[in-house]
């Protein structure tokens, strides 16, 4: 219920305040509300609210999966460097593409956003593939966690080097993307994003039984017939893909606002 309340507040509040009744009429197609208000709701605030809702669901599931694997309430996709991988992918496109840099990509509009999204997905999945490979070679979760943190630092170091050789305009474009925002997702992008997440989120529910067994500890889970390495591979892959898609569309955002208070 609180999510719905916050969602409607997002539709009502802003630089232009729109009465709640008018927002309801616009969504339901009732009444004759000003065209300006209709454009604000349909083209800006509603896509932003739906994107935040779906992205939050995806990152919450991803965070839960990582917390279960490492049995640590502070674990998350960013710990394994997956978010840093997405940032690195975008950095290669924006900072090293010369005439196709951040300024030119912004002028391409939708196609520019698609290019950034693809770069973020490739970067995230590249780091995730490395993590998956390492997960098959190491036994302890703590070792894998440390390696993931190291990969994240390496990715950030690469980004720093790319910034050093880039022009001011491209660096500014990259920094804006790196702030993370739901507002830059257009209506068409939002529909594609929601469609992809509508497939990925139900698929992640198939791992509920596996996650419950992993909560018992590796010893108990193994005695109950669970293949620990295979389960860890599936969970990390699921968390990585969810994070990659969200980061591609929304930028590097944190999955849990209350994490700093734990």
What do these predicted ranges mean?
Residues 1-261:
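Alpha-helical transmembrane segments in inner-membrane proteins
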């Amino acid at each position: 219920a609180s999510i719905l309340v916050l969602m409607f507040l997002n539709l009502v509040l802003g630089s232009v305040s729109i009465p709640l009744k008018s927002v309801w009429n616009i969504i339901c197609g009732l009444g004759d509300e000003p065209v300006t208000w209709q454009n604000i709701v349909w083209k800006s605030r509603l896509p932003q609210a739906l994107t935040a809702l779906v992205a939050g669901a995806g990152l919450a599931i991803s965070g839960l999966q990582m917390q279960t694997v490492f049995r640590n309430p502070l674990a998350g996709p960013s710990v394994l460097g997956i978010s840093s991988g997405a940032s690195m992918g975008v950095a290669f496109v924006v900072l090293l593409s010369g005439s196709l840099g951040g300024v030119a990509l912004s002028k391409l509009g939708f196609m520019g956003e698609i290019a950034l999204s693809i770069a973020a997905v490739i970067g995230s999945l590249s780091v995730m593939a490395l993590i998956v490979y390492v997960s098959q070679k190491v036994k302890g979760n703590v070792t894998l966690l440390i390696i993931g943190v190291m990969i994240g630092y390496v990715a950030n170091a690469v980004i720093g080097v790319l910034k050093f050789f880039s022009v001011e305009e491209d660096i500014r474009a990259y920094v804006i993307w790196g702030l993370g925002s739901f507002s830059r997702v257009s209506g068409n992008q939002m529909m594609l994003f929601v469609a992809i997440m509508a497939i990925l989120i139900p698929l992640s529910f198939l791992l509920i039984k596996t996650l419950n067994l992993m909560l018992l500890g590796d010893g108990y889970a193994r005695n109950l017939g669970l293949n620990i390495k295979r389960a860890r591979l599936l969970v990390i892959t699921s968390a990585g893909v969810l994070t990659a898609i969200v980061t591609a569309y929304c930028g590097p955002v944190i999955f849990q606002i209350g994490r700093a208070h734990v």
